[in-house]
Swiss-Prot record:
Disulfide bonds join 5-103, 23-84. Its EC number is 4.6.1.24. It comes from the Eukaryota. Belongs to the ribonuclease N1/T1 family. It catalyses: [RNA] containing guanosine + H2O = an [RNA fragment]-3'-guanosine-3'-phosphate + a 5'-hydroxy-ribonucleotide-3'-[RNA fragment]. The active site is at residues 39, 58, 92. It holds the Pfam family Ribonuclease. This is Guanyl-specific ribonuclease Th1. GO terms for molecular function: lyase activity; ribonuclease T1 activity; RNA binding; RNA endonuclease activity. Keywords: Disulfide bond, Endonuclease, Hydrolase, Lyase, Nuclease. SUPFAM superfamilies: Microbial ribonucleases. InterPro entries: N1-like, Ribonuclease/ribotoxin, Ribonuclease_N1/T1. It comes from Trichoderma harzianum (Hypocrea lixii).
Length: 106
C-alpha cells in the first residue's frame, strides 16, 4: 500500500514499517515510548477499510521516514485491525477539528 496524505507521499515500505511496528505493540500490549500509540481507533468517521472488521488501531506514520517511537505523532496514521492487516492510512490534514480524512491511494 502507498498513500498520499496532504502533500506527503508514503512508500509501501514506509506503510509496512509503521504497520509492523503497530502490530508488534498491539500484540505485546504495549505502546511506543511514553505515548498512547497504538490505541483503539473507533472509526467515528465511518471508513469502510477494505471490508475488515474492528477492533482497529491507529499508529503514527511519520513524514521523516522514521518509525514512530514516541513524542509528537504528527497528522498521519496507519490503521490496522486486530489481525494486523493494514486497513488504511488516514490524516488530520484537511479534516475539521480532531477528525480524520482518508489519504489518497487507500
Amino acid at each position: 500500500d502507498t498513500a498520499t496524505c496532504g502533500k506527503v507521499f508514503y512508500s509501501a515500505s514506509a506503510v509496512s514499517a509503521a504497520s509492523n511496528a503497530a502490530c508488534n505493540y498491539v500484540r505485546a500490549g504495549s505502546t511506543a515510548g511514553g505515548s498512547t500509540y497504538p490505541h483503539v481507533y473507533n472509526n467515528y468517521e465511518g471508513f469502510r477499510f477494505k471490508g475488515l472488521s474492528k477492533p482497529f488501531y491507529e499508529f503514527p506514520i511519520l513524514s521523516s521516514g522514521k518509525t514512530y517511537t514516541g513524542g509528537s505523532p504528527g497528522a498521519d496514521r496507519v490503521v490496522i485491525n486486530g489481525q494486523c492487516s493494514i486497513a488504511g492510512i488516514i490524516t488530520h490534514t484537511g479534516a475539521s477539528g480532531n477528525a480524520f480524512v482518508a489519504c489518497g491511494g487507500t
